[in-house]
Amino acid sequence: MAIGERIHFFRLLRGMTQKYLGMALGFPEKSADVRLAQYETGSRTPKADLTAALAQVLDVSPHALSVPDIDSYVGLMHTLFTLEDNYGLKVSEMDGEVCLKVDVRKSKDTARLHEMLCSWQQAAAMLEAGEISKEDYDKWRYHYPEFDKSQNYVKVPPQDLF
């Protein structure tokens, strides 16, 4: 998903018009909506400083706007393959369902990714149990890692034990 689609998604989520968001970013009123449309359609790509400003106005982390190319299933698959290469993500089967898991023994990076995924799973479980609202869950996701206070990560055994 390109950054323009994420801008569009969060703008609509916040109930903003293109003109409103553009003006909040400091664009002139006459061209604010046109500028935003250019970013949303991908004809222009915001630089880092504008991405940071967009994130602030949209009340999300800049990381929530900048995501890899997952506009197609093939692009998504290659993103997953990269995660397999770099972070030990593995595809497997459990109870007849395809699932993704992290081989925590691969490296320190995979152990850290596992911790982060466990934290995400805990937040999702809290949502499922009704302990937090969808709004709170989305706030947790869209500001990640800012509100990740769990620190209840699984301790990874040393590799020499295997």
Feature roles, as predicted:
Residues 4-26:
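Short basic helix-loop element that most often maps to the first helix and adjoining turn
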Residues 26-46, 67-70:
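Recognition helix of helix-turn-helix/homeodomain-like DNA-binding domains
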Residues 52-131, 160-162:
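Charged, helix-prone or intrinsically disordered regulatory segments positioned adjacent to compact structured domains
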Residues 134-142:
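Short, charged, amphipathic alpha-helical segments
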Residues 145-158:
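Short, charge-rich amphipathic alpha-helical segments embedded
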